[in-house]
């Protein structure tokens, strides 16, 4: 058994004893007609933040606050305590002359973690700390399970994620991260709304998993007796709305992919996709860099952020680099001189590039992407748009003007990681159907992430979709960069976890 396991077991043993004591206190409260769970509402007049920010107006006046008791230093006839609410903490002062002997005795029985409401007058201590001089109080929820005394001392890497509610109680920096997450998404909406985009909602359950190369989660609809998929992307439904005349749309929501989990991947994750009629991928680059800069300025106050000890500068314009140029710069291979698939496979073999399919089935485009992923991605530390992807790897994208071996697609990279993906959207229904047919062949070769045929989407393109630019941004990854967070689990409130034995 590891040292960390011993610490956890010791804590659980202590917690069990303390829980017995707390259950006994609850029984006594209930027998005395003071059951905290009979409290339905608290008439709170102020939050901790409001008391502190409005001290000059509130000094000497009576307020009622509520929160979780996080420290208690009451000895003899007086003492101090701290309660925490959403906005932070505020100090309380209690004295026997103000509440009486019985009430003070009751207050002393409160445990760390209990939730109380307090009424009292606002004042400042000799050290200048804004506090509340208690005249009355009420226990509104009894905490039966004790909080860890030293949360950072617990080494179980999963515990904070499994018990996020405790993590949020104990760690101010965790609360700050998720408050920033909310602010980032709110500001993203604000930017797009101000640009005339319309926020919409599209299906999460669909008979076809489309819009991305990924493994879907499969479920079954009993009434219709059909298998359905949790969406892997919102793209194809949003494009249908462009066809329908909604010229600027976006959706922020969860996507689901039945794939591996690591510090950058969670099976369900938050993405924004947006589409603009009469625009192309150059416009999407401008939206990306300008929107992220706007978010940085509004939420963080700067476009220069620290991430894992490196300064990342999100100031527009970002660097623009074609994939061919990136491979030439970082892998030392000039793809403009590669004549065909056979020559490309030879290069792949020399460079020891591995693929999901057999090397003999790989195209020149497959090899280009393989070289990029192997030699280039991790070099792209500052925000960079990698442009012009091979046509065979971008089935929903228009061909590059002037070079039909490539497409008008870019991905944005920061700190060696992809954060966004965008196209000049393919709107030719005939070509789109041909691309889908080629993807079906890829599936037959064993690529279970290749696109499915979506006949209704083809039908919508036959009705007619104007030239359109489309963009998708991984919100979780963006938030990781803007909060200097190492793992995606640290920016998702309740990340996917393997159940523990006995559901513990």
UniProtKB/Swiss-Prot annotation:
EC number(s): the record gives 6.1.1.6
CDD domains per the record?
LysRS_core, LysRS_N
Superkingdom as given in the UniProt entry: Bacteria
Q: Where does Mg(2+) 2 bind?
A: 418
> Is-annotated flag, keyword Transport?
no
Q: Which cofactor does it need?
A: Mg(2+)
Please share the entry's free-text remark on the cofactor. Binds 3 Mg(2+) ions per subunit.
Cysteine disulfide links: none
PROSITE patterns found in the cross-reference section? AA_TRNA_LIGASE_II
Question: Which Gene Ontology molecular function entries are recorded, alphabetically?
Answer: aspartate-tRNA ligase activity; ATP binding; catalytic activity, acting on a protein; lysine-tRNA ligase activity; magnesium ion binding; nucleic acid binding; transferase activity
What Pfam families does the record tag this protein with?
A: tRNA-synt_2, tRNA_anti-codon
Task: Write down the chemical reaction(s) this protein catalyses.
Answer: tRNA(Lys) + L-lysine + ATP = L-lysyl-tRNA(Lys) + AMP + diphosphate
- GO biological process per UniProt: aspartyl-tRNA aminoacylation; lysyl-tRNA aminoacylation
Subcellular location per UniProt equals:
Cytoplasm
| Binding positions (Mg(2+) 1) | 411, 418
A cellular component term, taken from the record's GO annotations: cytoplasm
**Keywords of this entry:** Aminoacyl-tRNA synthetase, ATP-binding, Cytoplasm, Ligase, Magnesium, Metal-binding, Nucleotide-binding, Protein biosynthesis
- How the protein assembles, per its UniProt entry? Homodimer.
Indicate the family of this protein: Belongs to the class-II aminoacyl-tRNA synthetase family.
Which HAMAP family does the record match to this protein? Answer: Lys_tRNA_synth_class2
Protein's name according to its UniProt entry: Lysine--tRNA ligase
